[in-house]
């Protein structure tokens, strides 16, 4: 039944655009160049406005998710990486529930990846239609069918570009993956902007700068009471403050510290005597995958809730899913959940909000920890990183665990890998919650993603440098 499903969609996968694997080893400097080109294309798409939209100034329903999903309001990157991540989430859940089975052969894995890409394109079209028909760019009846279709086509083509850019890096032409690169860029851009933004905001206390550091100097220069000015710079509401910035740096340091936690399993060569090595099992065994999938789940729930709330406002079941309110305080107009399931699955705005509504905080903590642990545990089964897959890789390299035969390696690895995956996912969720409660810039999830992705690129750079021998030879 499961394999039949993949076989059914095989003809459709064959007609999808695909990046061919490189026929030769790509040098590091070429990888850096392709990564830079990929990032440049993404950033250009983030600045090109959608043609035909009447307005994008209304309250943004996905403001809270845009940093994580690398999307930009009213541009070609409106959908960001959401379709790719959502298709991965769906395929993972189907594989985890054994509705479809992914074999160990490269053919089955390639078919699974093709199915994921196909679903990504279908989801892109679906999300584009929902965005247009719910009036995000103006009343569809006023815009007309032709303009609506044009906007949908633009979003689809942009989504296809993101899919291909991600595949370009994944196939080995660049460094890391497109998803990781786009997320990290978007989050780092947000942090720098919130710290140094020269944009002025008219508050009840007078005109203030949005950037926390610029606001500090501005307040000290314009206020006669310097102590009060410092207090405002550190604790002002609805705008980035210095405590948010300090919390962000603190979370960066904590996550980097946890990146070093691992268990080294001793292994030896089955062919050569005296050749010993270690196989590291990191605390963050599945890296940032759990938090990416959790973000995709929540963002799609937001989309559904917003769509239903627009069409069926006041309906009891719709309100049970989520009720929304618009605000423009401290930045662009945005919609945020004030009730229903969406409210309880969204992070509290500050530590003060935790004290005001502890039930909200408890439900959010349980959801974050549980979902991250679940996604981490199920991801290892479909990504080729389970105990059985690792044992197979070691066997192919003619390596065995010291003190164990080949037949008992899977059993021994099963003692560590599923535990590391589940506990690592739990820690990822816990760190994200901590960052949210501390008020870190870019949300706890965003900070966590940025740090893990930057650390991955650091590891890639170190690995390439060790192979080449020097930094000069690496780049020039």
Swiss-Prot record:
Residues 2-33, 97-117, 166-172, 262-288, 376-420, 463-476 are cytoplasmic. InterPro entries: SecY/SEC61-alpha, SecY_CS, SecY_dom_sf, Translocon_Sec61/SecY_plug_dom. Its main location: endoplasmic reticulum. Keywords: Developmental protein, Endoplasmic reticulum, Membrane, Protein transport, Translocation, Transmembrane, Transmembrane helix, Transport. One of its GO terms (cellular component) is Sec61 translocon complex. GO terms for biological process: cotranslational protein targeting to membrane; habenula development; post-translational protein targeting to membrane, translocation; pronephric nephron development; protein insertion into ER membrane; SRP-dependent cotranslational protein targeting to membrane, translocation. The keyword Endoplasmic reticulum applies. It comes from the Eukaryota. Residues 54-76, 139-144, 194-240, 310-354, 442-445 are lumenal. Belongs to the SecY/SEC61-alpha family. This is Protein transport protein Sec61 subunit alpha-like 1.
């Amino acid at each position: 039944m499961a394999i039949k499903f993949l076989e059914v969609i095989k003809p459709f996968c064959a007609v999808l655009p695909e990046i061919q694997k490189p026929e030769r080893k790509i040098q590091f400097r070429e990888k850096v160049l392709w990564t830079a080109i990929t990032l440049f294309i993404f950033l250009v798409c983030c600045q090109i406005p959608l043609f035909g939209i009447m307005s994008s100034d209304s309250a943004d329903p996905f403001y809270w998710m845009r940093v994580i999903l690398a999307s930009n309001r009213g541009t070609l990157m409106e959908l960001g990486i959401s379709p790719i991540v959502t298709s991965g989430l769906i395929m993972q859940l189907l594989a985890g529930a054994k509705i479809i089975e992914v074999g160990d052969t490269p053919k089955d894995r390639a078919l699974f990846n093709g199915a994921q890409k196909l679903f990504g394109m279908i989801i892109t079209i679906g999300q584009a239609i929902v965005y247009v028909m719910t009036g995000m760019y103006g009343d569809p009846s006023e815009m007309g069918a032709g303009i609506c279709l044009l906007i949908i086509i633009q979003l689809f083509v942009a989504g296809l570009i993101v899919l291909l850019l991600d595949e370009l890096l994944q196939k080995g032409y660049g460094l890391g993956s497109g998803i990781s690169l786009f997320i990290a860029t978007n989050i780092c851009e947000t942090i720098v902007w919130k710290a140094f933004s020269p944009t002025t905001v008219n508050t009840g206390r007078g005109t203030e700068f949005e950037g926390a550091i610029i606001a500090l100097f501005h307040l000290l220069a314009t206020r006669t009471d310097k102590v009060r000015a410092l207090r405002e710079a550190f604790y002002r509401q609805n705008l980035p403050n210095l405590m948010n910035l300090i919390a962000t740096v603190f979370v960066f340091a904590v996550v980097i510290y946890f990146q070093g936690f691992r268990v080294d399993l001793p292994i030896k060569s089955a062919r050569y005597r005296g050749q010993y090595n270690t196989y590291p099992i990191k605390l963050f065994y599945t890296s940032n995958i759990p938090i990416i999938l959790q973000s995709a789940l929540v963002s799609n729930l937001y989309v559904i809730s917003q769509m239903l709330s627009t069409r069926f406002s006041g309906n009891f079941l719709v309100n049970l899913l989520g009720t929304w309110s618009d605000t423009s305080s401290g930045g662009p107009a945005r919609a945020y959940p004030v009730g229903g399931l969406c409210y309880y699955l969204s992070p509290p705005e500050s530590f003060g909000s935790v004290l005001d509504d502890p039930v909200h905080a408890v439900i959010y903590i349980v959801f974050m920890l549980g979902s991250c642990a679940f996604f981490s545990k199920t991801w290892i089964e479909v990504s080729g990183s389970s105990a059985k897959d690792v044992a197979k890789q070691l066997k192919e390299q003619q390596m065995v665990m010291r003190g164990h035969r080949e037949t008992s390696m899977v059993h021994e690895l099963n003692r560590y890998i599923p535990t590391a995956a589940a506990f690592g996912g739990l820690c990822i969720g816990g760190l994200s919650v901590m960052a949210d409660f501390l008020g870190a810039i870019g949300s706890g999830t965003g900070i966590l993603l940025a740090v893990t992705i930057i650390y991955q690129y650091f590891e890639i750079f170190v690995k390439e440098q060790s192979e080449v021998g020097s930094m000069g030879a690496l780049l020039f």
